[in-house]
Curated annotation (Swiss-Prot):
Gene for this chain: atpF
Molecular function in Gene Ontology: proton-transporting ATP synthase activity, rotational mechanism; proton-transporting ATPase activity, rotational mechanism
A single cellular component GO annotation: plasma membrane
UniProt KW keywords: ATP synthesis, Cell inner membrane, Cell membrane, CF(0), Hydrogen ion transport, Ion transport, Membrane, Transmembrane, Transmembrane helix, Transport
Membrane topology: Single-pass membrane protein
Name used for this protein in its record: ATP synthase subunit b
UniProt-listed Pfam families: ATP-synt_B
Role this protein plays: F(1)F(0) ATP synthase produces ATP from ADP in the presence of a proton or sodium gradient. F-type ATPases consist of two structural domains, F(1) containing the extramembraneous catalytic core and F(0) containing the membrane proton channel, linked together by a central stalk and a peripheral stalk. During catalysis, ATP synthesis in the catalytic domain of F(1) is coupled via a rotary mechanism of the central stalk subunits to proton translocation. Component of the F(0) channel, it forms part of the peripheral stalk, linking F(1) to F(0).
Length: 179
């Protein structure tokens, strides 16, 4: 047993090629004992720990895949929601533009109608006033003619006297109108 604990001169007896059967046997026995001890006490916990680690890694990978799929689903839903909002905004803008155009046309038509009505009313009033003025003028002309005729009949003057009488009467006209 003392030879087991003593150092073996590897190079002294001929080098590495020399095999010592006792040392080989004890090395094999030690290896097998260590293998049995490790197998009985360490191998189970190591395998269990590796299995647990593998399970936790698989769960983490599965969880990451689920979260990624959920994130992609949410992203697609968000993109669809954004596209829908943009379509609705464009539709609302188009409808507002149509309403503004319709209102503009309605107001323009209403303004034209009111302007046409005002022009028609003004023309009617002008025609009425013109008719009144013509009637009044005719009445004044008739009065003037009657007055001039009565003066001519009373005076029975020659042409020169008649002309002077008419000119005098015409000169008095603005005074008659003001009165």
């Amino acid at each position: 047993m003392a030879s087991f604990l003593s150092p073996v001169p590897v190079l002294a007896a001929g080098g590495i090629a020399d095999i010592n059967p006792g040392l080989t046997l004890w090395t094999a026995i030690t290896f097998l004992v260590m293998l049995v001890v490790l197998g009985k006490f360490a191998w189970g916990p190591i395998v269990k720990m590796l299995a647990e680690r593998e399970r936790s890694i698989r769960e983490a990978i599965d969880s990451a895949k689920k979260e990624r799929a959920e994130a992609e689903r949410l992203l697609a839903a968000q993109k669809e929601s954004l596209a829908k909002a943009q379509r609705e905004a464009a539709e609302l803008a188009r409808r507002n533009q149509q309403e503004v155009e319709a209102l503009r046309q309605e107001l323009t038509a209403k303004a034209r109608k009111e302007a046409d009505e005002l022009v028609a009313e003004a023309r009617r009033q002008i025609a009425e006033e013109l008719g009144k003025a013509k009637t009044e003028l005719k009445a004044q002309v008739v009065d003037l003619a009657i007055d001039a005729a009565s003066r001519l009949v009373k005076a029975n003057l020659d042409e020169k006297a008649q002309r002077a009488l008419v000119e005098e009467y015409i000169a008095q006209l603005p005074a008659n109108r003001a009165a």
